[in-house]
Structures are given as C-alpha cells and as structure tokens.
A protein has these predicted regions:
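N-terminal post-signal-peptidase region of extra-cytosolic proteins
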Residues: 1-6, 11, 59
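Short, conserved beta-strand element in jelly-roll/cupin
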Residues: 10-25, 29, 40-53
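Extracytoplasmic/periplasmic copper-protein system
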Residues: 103-115
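Conserved metal-binding segment of the jelly-roll/cupin
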Residues: 65-85
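A mature extracytoplasmic/lumenal domain signature
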Residues: 12, 19-22, 27-31, 78-79, ...
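His/acidic/aromatic-lined binding-pocket segments of jelly-roll/cupin-type domains
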Residues: 6-7, 14-17, 63-64, 71-72
C-alpha cells in the first residue's frame, strides 16, 4: 500500500480556499519516517514554522474530495497532503499568526519579488 506524502506544522493552523480545480486532500494520521524542517530553512523561517514532512499513514487518515469554493481548516499538528489531482488545484492558503510570532508589518519575502 502506497501512502500519500504530506506535511504537518508544529504550531501553524492553515486555511485553504479552493479557487479553481480540485483534488483529494488527505488529512489526519501521522507522518511516518518524517523529515523535520531545519531551524534556518525557508519552511521554518518564512512559510510555516517548524514542520515535518513524509508519508501519511494511520487508521484515522481521511480523504476529502475538494473543489472550487471549498474552504478547509487544517489545525496545527494535523498531517495533510494532496493526491488524485486530475488537472490542477489552485488555492489560497491563509496562515493566521495569533501568537504574534511574526513582527508587525511582516511581508512574506516572496511577495517582494516581481511576478
């Protein structure tokens, strides 16, 4: 049995707003043989804070078929990943910072680059 790949974030809740396309979002379970993001990596410092990526497995893994207009909230610590994307899935990822880890006025460095 092949397990889908995914990631979990130690402290970061994410909200996905599906703006076009769709696929199957896998949540739950646990990350097996995961790789922790390095303390100075972009994943940790810019994107999601400390995270762990690898295969997702376990009896509580749930597959959600999502489509344009769906909104999904993924709590911190919950493994998640994509599978069965037939064409594409575009989504807006919202990552709130209720603990105010980021400095006031923070702008993601990727947003400072021209498109």
């Amino acid at each position: 049995m092949r397990h889908p790949g995914g990631i979990s974030h130690d402290h970061q809740t994410e909200t996905y707003i599906i703006v076009s396309g769709g696929g199957t979002l896998v949540t739950g379970g646990r990350v097996v043989n995961g790789r922790k993001s390095g303390p100075d990596s972009d994943v940790t410092k810019v994107l999601n804070g400390p995270s762990c990526s690898g295969a997702i497995a376990g009896p509580d893994v749930v597959k959600h078929v999502v489509k344009t207009g769906d909104v999904i909230i993924i709590p911190a610590g919950v493994p998640h990943g994509w599978t069965d994307i037939t064409d594409h899935v575009d989504y807006l990822s919202v990552r709130p910072d209720p603990d105010r880890v980021l400095p006031a006025g923070y702008i993601n460095p990727l947003m400072k680059k021209p498109f």
